């Protein structure tokens, strides 16, 4: 938003004041530790989506936010260009998100590993389920907090059927289409059995990709991975017994493991932040995290009214 004031003085002057929030480049901040080597904490929080993360509830001019995928790539590029970065700690607190966003995050992390040749240790926090766990599969090692909820390996499609309420209101949607199934999944009519089967085939295919990745990255037999991927959630202890994770520990334990994997005895723990963004310790959240209310409403914002969405998401 730009305000323009015209002042009639000796010569006409125009003063332009730009009140639009500006996104500034990331800065590096050391939150603890010492030495030349660096361990960078990268955060994945909230619903994984390529949508802009503008506040759902805000008063006045909302602060500038950067979409999660944009921020992730920006952080990984900054880390890969720094020869002193010896390890990445990927802190995950997410129930998952869209299939595509989850897969892009996994791919970006794998590309970083290939380029930078530094270990990635995933630290699972409150929830690292479905797409959150999918992203963790890119790590060299997965460590869960003792109270982490993970798993929910599977695919879901959510849509809305408003036909009943519209019928009661005497409203009807008029659709002109080129083919019988062009509007399949529309909220204005129910699915036919044939269309439900079509959607199920898509779900099964996307689910198969998830299961294949679990089997490959966790070195599990495909039938075992498929058995674990029925959508249920697991505690940290259950996930460890099922070989879905490598260890249980706290964030300091993860940092110690990162130092060991990097082959250094001491290192600076580094986060990337925007100017004025508060990140004084390794527990501080990045700007994309949002408030608790925003986190609760984020799945609704992700789904929107744009039709069916295919999700790697745990949303009880």
Task: Go through each PLM region and give its residues.
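Flexible, glycine/proline-enriched loop segments at strand-loop-helix junctions
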Residues: 151-153
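N-terminal organellar transit peptides
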Residues: 1-145, 156-316
């Amino acid at each position: 938003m730009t305000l323009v004031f015209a002042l009639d003085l000796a010569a006409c002057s125009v003063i332009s004041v730009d009140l639009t929030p500006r996104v500034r480049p990331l800065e590096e901040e050391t939150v603890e530790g010492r030495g030349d080597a660096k361990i960078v904490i990268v955060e994945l929080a909230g619903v994984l989506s390529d949508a802009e993360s503008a506040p759902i509830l805000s008063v006045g001019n909302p602060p500038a936010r950067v979409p999660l995928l944009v921020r992730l790539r920006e952080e990984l590029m900054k880390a890969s260009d720094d020869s002193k970065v010896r390890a990445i700690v990927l802190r995950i607190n997410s129930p998952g998100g869209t299939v595509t966003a989850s897969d892009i995050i996994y791919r970006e992390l794998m590309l970083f590993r290939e380029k930078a040749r530094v270990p990635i240790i995933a630290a699972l926090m409150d929830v690292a389920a479905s797409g959150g766990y999918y992203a963790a599969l890119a790590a060299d090692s997965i460590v869960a907090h003792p109270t982490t909820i993970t798993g929910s390996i599977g695919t879901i499609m959510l849509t809305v059927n408003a036909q009943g309420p519209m019928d009661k209101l005497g409203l009807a949607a008029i659709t002109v289409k080129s083919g019988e199934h062009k509007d399949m999944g529309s909220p204005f009519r129910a699915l036919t059995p044939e269309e439900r089967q079509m959607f199920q085939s898509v779900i099964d295919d996307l689910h198969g990709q998830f299961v294949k990745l679990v089997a490959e990255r966790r070195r599990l037999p495909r039938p075992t991975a498929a058995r674990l991927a029925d959508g249920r959630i697991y505690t940290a202890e259950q996930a460890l017994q099922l070989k879905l994770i490598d260890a249980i520990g706290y964030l300091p334990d993860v940092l110690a493991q990162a130092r060991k994997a990097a082959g250094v005895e001491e290192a600076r723990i580094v986060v990337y932040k925007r100017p004025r963004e508060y990140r004084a310790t390794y527990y501080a959240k990045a700007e994309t995290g949002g408030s608790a209310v925003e986190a609760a409403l984020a799945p609704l914002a992700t789904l929107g009214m744009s039709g069916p969405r295919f999700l790697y998401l745990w949303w009880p």
